[in-house]
């Protein structure tokens, strides 16, 4: 295994997933929900994400502002639980999550962005959810020859297209044995990001 890949791309994402499993696993999440500890749920989720470089600092601030109120934290906590642990079709859960994020209080910067909408599913369920940063992912898709359609407002229809692209990449990389969406997202990040030279 490439040590640079592990250090620069995979390890901190796996660490965030492990933190999620320790701090917001299903049982712990339910205990906090039943006790109406919405602010604690939001605090833990934001803290777990803050140890990564996944979302931009202005998005981190917008998210913290949005869950600062009890109402914002309650909506966030219930919506996040539904996304990660709820029953039903992924399509319905994702659309409800987008509606929740759209309803969160906005102080300065909008909260309804692709990175914010996809980061927590990715951290909690990296075998299922893809973390979508539109600019880098679109560059990677273009380089890959995949027609990734982009719509700025998050929706299941657009996310499904991103998941289809991730599934194609996973199949194409099957000889490398990608473990989860962390490997797929990291591969596409390296392809599309200016951080990595050709």
What are these regions (language model features)?
Residues 117-125:
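Contiguous, well-ordered alpha-helical segments that form the cores/surfaces of helical PPI scaffolds
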């Amino acid at each position: 295994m490439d040590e640079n890949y592990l250090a620069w791309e995979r390890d901190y994402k796996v660490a965030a997933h492990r933190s999620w499993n320790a701090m917001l696993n299903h049982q712990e999440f339910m205990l906090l929900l039943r006790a109406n500890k919405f602010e604690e749920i939001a605090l833990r989720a934001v803290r777990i994400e803050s140890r990564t470089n996944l979302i931009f600092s202005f998005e981190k601030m917008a998210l913290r502002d949005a869950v600062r109120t009890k109402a914002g934290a309650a909506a966030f906590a219930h919506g996040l639980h539904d996304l990660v642990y709820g029953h039903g079709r992924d399509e319905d859960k994702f659309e409800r999550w987008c509606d929740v994020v759209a309803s969160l209080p906005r102080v300065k910067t909008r909260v309804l962005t692709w990175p914010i909408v996809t980061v927590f599913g990715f951290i909690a369920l990296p075998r299922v959810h893809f973390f979508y940063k539109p600019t880098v992912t679109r560059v990677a898709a273009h380089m890959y020859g995949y027609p990734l359609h982009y719509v700025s407002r998050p929706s299941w229809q657009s996310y499904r297209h991103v998941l289809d692209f991730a599934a194609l990449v996973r199949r194409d990389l099957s000889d490398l044995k990608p473990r989860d969406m962390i490997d797929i997202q990291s591969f596409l990040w390296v392809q599309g990001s200016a951080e990595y030279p050709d």
